[in-house]
Amino acid sequence: MRFTKVVGFLSVLGLAAVFPLTAQAEKAGTAGAGEWDKLGTYTYTYSSPTVYSTGGDFRVCLSGSTPFSVSLHLYEDDPGDNPDDYVGANYFSPGECHTFGSIGKFVDGSNNKAEFFVTDYSGKSKTVTFYD
């Protein structure tokens, strides 16, 4: 009987090591200084929705579920007749992130924010996540 209890205890201990007993919750709200604030995850074909950035650095991640690599071009959206400002481009593999640094010069308008979107010419659906 004692042997059965020891085997049972070791089995439970082994399972606890394989399957964590705590779950990680996604942090809501604004991250602290030096941390990334998630602005959203979007699936699009030609141009992503516009997101708002407060400046500093801006991060774009291509989802690992996107089954191809692609060059994404980052623009700052200017409303009306003003042409959009080209920020830059990077080549992304699935699951890869790139940071666009020092984008504070694109902060403008009455909301004192930069309005960013990405575009590409693949014509295929893809999913991206933006961080500020």
Curated annotation (Swiss-Prot):
Signal peptide: 1-25
Domain of life: Bacteria
Keywords of this entry: Signal
Protein name: Uncharacterized protein YndA
Organism in which the protein naturally occurs: Bacillus subtilis (strain 168)
